[in-house]
């Protein structure tokens, strides 16, 4: 469970800091349902840009933002992309909730909020003393640095040196310090080593997304809730929510699947990873190019026992489709050859690299279970193609100029031709094998307790269920914090 013990001195400092910087903190309930947000805050949002460094943008940590760069408010149905069957090659519906319309263009501001907020409103993190350290393979440290800036905290972003240029360029304007560790997406051990080094400084507080229970708390209560709302809004008579697929970086989004399985007991939940680093599937390891996922370990916060399937995606598939979806030649192919509408084609740019991998997982699941037009599979799009123009440029340099023939080949080879290989429907024993891998990273290397590891497997009620239920207690602390600052009353 999340420690919500109050540190009175730190809390007093944070309240004063919030007063000085006009910071009002949103509740989880408001992130679920923006109708609960005060009208005066909505009035401020109506003339605030989506990426503006303004504390009021904390209230845009929601799947319900209007699809506007400036002055957007909220909408009943979350932003999403439906993948047409003529593109996916499967008859079932695939709906993908979009992270593009969060501040920073990525839903990781939510996970980082879920990690920071409990320590901020309890005073365990003292904004006048501590630096917030965000170890990440890219987007989480962007979200953490952004939230730190909004909350007037100093931040340190840690990410692998081979991540996209766009990530580093943006971080330079937001983070107090950027540390580039050796390697690529899958080199998370090097990130952990750096955090141990930083821990020697008492002013450095680590918010490790792979281990912080605030991450699954947020995704269960906000992402899972929103995906359920989306399905209920778009389903047609006779359709069922058959499956959900999430590639695993920190595995935070997998807890959205925990909520979905409670609401839709027959739903199958799949975790995805890169074929080049298939740790879950076959204890594999290696570098890969699906930025944001697959880090050669099993995250502490992954409820493996509740996971039905593991799916590995070839990183070449996601790279080639990124170019198909985001070049003039690819767009022309989708319009002229597939008959996709202008809106459908333009929305394909809402898929970043890991989002493409998520959709490919959905297709493989659909083929494995032989899903029909009466089935719906859901997923999320962590970020959009905005973060990867440099990768598209690299692909053009590597493979030459794009054309209609290449577009057709990419669609056929990297989407339509997906097979049910490199995937595994997990038995009880296979799930436990994956869960047990946590021991080597978290108990042997990172100082976790073996009793807690066993409790994750044998005591769901007092581990995963208990964390999910802490949203109510956290909201009470947030409300008390806002009341202490007096800023809500002064609106």
Predicted regions located by residue number:
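PLP-dependent amino-acid enzyme catalytic core
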Residues: 1-491
């Amino acid at each position: 469970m999340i420690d919500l013990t109050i540190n009175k001195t730190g809390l007093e400092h944070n309240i004063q800091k919030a007063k000085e910087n006009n910071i009002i903190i949103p509740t989880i309930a408001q992130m679920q349902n923006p109708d609960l947000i005060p009208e005066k805050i909505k009035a401020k949002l109506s003339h605030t840009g989506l990426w503006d460094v303004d504390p009021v943008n904390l209230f845009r940590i929601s799947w319900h933002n209007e699809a506007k760069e400036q002055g957007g408010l909220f909408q009943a149905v979350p932003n999403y992309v439906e993948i047409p069957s003529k593109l996916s090659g499967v008859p079932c519906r695939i709906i993908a909730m979009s992270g593009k319309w969060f501040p920073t263009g990525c839903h990781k501001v939510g996970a980082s909020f879920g990690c920071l907020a409990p320590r901020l409103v309890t005073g365990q993190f003292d904004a006048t003393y501590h630096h917030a350290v965000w170890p990440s393979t890219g987007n989480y440290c962007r979200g953490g640095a952004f939230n730190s800036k909004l909350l007037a905290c100093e931040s340190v972003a840690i990410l692998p040196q081979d991540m996209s240029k766009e990530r580093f360029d943006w971080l330079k304007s937001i983070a107090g310090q950027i540390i580039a560790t050796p390697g690529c997406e899958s080199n998370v051990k090097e990130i952990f080593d750096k955090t141990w080094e930083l821990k020697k400084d008492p002013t450095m507080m680590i918010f490790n997304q792979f281990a912080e229970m605030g991450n699954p708390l947020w995704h269960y209560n906000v992402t899972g809730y929103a995906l359920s709302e989306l399905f209920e809004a778009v389903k047609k008579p006779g359709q069922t929510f058959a499956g959900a697929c999430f590639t695993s970086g920190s595995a935070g989004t997998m807890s959205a699947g925990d909520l979905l399985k409670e609401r839709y007991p027959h739903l199958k939940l799949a975790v995805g990873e890169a074929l080049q680093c298939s740790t879950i599937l076959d204890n594999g390891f290696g570098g890969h190019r699906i930025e944001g996922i697959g880090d050669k370990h099993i995250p502490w916060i992954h409820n493996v026992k509740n996971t039905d399937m593991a799916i590995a995606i070839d990183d070449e598939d996601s790279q080639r489709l990124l170019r198909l979806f985001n070049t003039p030649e690819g767009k022309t192919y989708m319009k002229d050859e597939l008959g996709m509408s202008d809106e459908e084609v333009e929305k394909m740019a809402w898929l970043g690299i890991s989002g493409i991998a998520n959709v490919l997982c959905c297709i493989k699941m659909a083929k494995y279970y032989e899903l029909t037009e009466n089935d719906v599979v859901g997923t999320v799009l962590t970020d959009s193609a905005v973060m990867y123009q440099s990768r598209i440029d690299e692909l053009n340099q590597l493979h030459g100029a794009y054309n209609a023939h290449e577009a057709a080949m990419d669609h056929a080879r990297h989407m339509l031709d997906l097979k049910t290989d490199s995937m595994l429907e997990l038995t009880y024993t296979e799930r436990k094998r994956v869960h047990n891998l946590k021991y080597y990273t978290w108990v042997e290397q990172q100082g976790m307790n073996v009793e807690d590891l066993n409790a994750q497997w044998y005591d769901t009620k007092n581990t995963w269920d208990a964390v999910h239920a802490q949203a109510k207690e956290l909201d009470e602390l947030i409300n008390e914090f806002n009341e202490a600052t007096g800023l809500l009353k002064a609106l």
